[in-house]
């Protein structure tokens, strides 16, 4: 049996925070605002995986109203989601991700993101694709107000 899930997330930029995307710290003047570390890409992958197994979304499992998850490491959240995936008997077929950001440039960091995501999903790097695009200065990402991300995941039993 195969299952497909889709994820999407958005976070706005904020002063005084680290920018962590795909489990990788990226040098930049701002970070992303969120209850956890606001890793927009790992949140997207978690949502896609939860959707594929019919377990809701990241907000259901790690609500921003719970102080336990304040400043949480999103890698730990994704690892917890992956345990649910494994409990249901699934492994990764592949995951395809897109980061939507005007700045900073993501290309230099994509190999490290792929490696970290593969590690978290107990998979080979060949099963993980990460790409980045801009919105050609249109919308909130184009104005440099934040970053969006989307992912599609294929799980196999």
From Swiss-Prot:
Any one GO biological process: terpenoid biosynthetic process
Pathway assigned to this chain's UniProt record: Isoprenoid biosynthesis; isopentenyl diphosphate biosynthesis via DXP pathway; isopentenyl diphosphate from 1-deoxy-D-xylulose 5-phosphate: step 4/6
Entry annotated with the keyword Lyase: yes
Superkingdom, natural source: Bacteria
Required cofactor(s): a divalent metal cation
Keywords assigned: Isoprene biosynthesis, Lyase, Metal-binding
Binding site for 4-CDP-2-C-methyl-D-erythritol 2-phosphate: 9-11, 35-36, 57-59, 62-66, 101-107, 133-136, 140, 143
Cofactor comment: Binds 1 divalent metal cation per subunit.
A molecular-function term among this protein's GO annotations: metal ion binding
Catalyzed reactions per annotation: 4-CDP-2-C-methyl-D-erythritol 2-phosphate = 2-C-methyl-D-erythritol 2,4-cyclic diphosphate + CMP
Record flagged with keyword Metal-binding: yes
Chain positions recorded as a divalent metal cation binding sites: 9, 11, 43
Site positions per UniProt: Transition state stabilizer: 35, 134
EC number annotated for this UniProt entry: 4.6.1.12
EC supergroup of this enzyme: lyase
Assigned protein family: Belongs to the IspF family.
Biological role: Involved in the biosynthesis of isopentenyl diphosphate (IPP) and dimethylallyl diphosphate (DMAPP), two major building blocks of isoprenoid compounds. Catalyzes the conversion of 4-diphosphocytidyl-2-C-methyl-D-erythritol 2-phosphate (CDP-ME2P) to 2-C-methyl-D-erythritol 2,4-cyclodiphosphate (ME-CPP) with a corresponding release of cytidine 5-monophosphate (CMP).
Quaternary structure annotation from Swiss-Prot or TrEMBL: Homotrimer.
Designated name of the protein: 2-C-methyl-D-erythritol 2,4-cyclodiphosphate synthase
Organism: Halalkalibacterium halodurans (strain ATCC BAA-125 / DSM 18197 / FERM 7344 / JCM 9153 / C-125) (Bacillus halodurans)
């Amino acid at each position: 049996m195969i299952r497909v899930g889709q994820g999407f997330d958005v976070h706005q930029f904020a002063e005084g925070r680290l920018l962590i995307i795909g489990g990788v710290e990226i040098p930049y003047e701002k970070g992303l605002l969120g209850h956890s570390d606001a890793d927009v890409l790992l949140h997207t992958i978690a949502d896609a995986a939860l959707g594929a197994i019919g377990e809701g979304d990241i907000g259901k499992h790690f609500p921003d109203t719970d102080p336990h998850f304040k400043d949480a490491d999103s890698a730990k959240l994704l690892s917890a989601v992956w345990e649910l995936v494994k409990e249901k008997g699934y492994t990764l077929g592949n995951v395809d991700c897109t980061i939507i950001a005007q700045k900073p440039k993501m290309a230099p960091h994509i190999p490290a993101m792929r490696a970290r995501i593969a590690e978290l999903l107990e998979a080979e790097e060949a099963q993980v694709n990460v790409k980045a695009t801009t919105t050609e200065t249109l919308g909130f990402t184009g104005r440099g107000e934040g970053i969006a991300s989307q992912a599609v995941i294929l799980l196999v039993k």
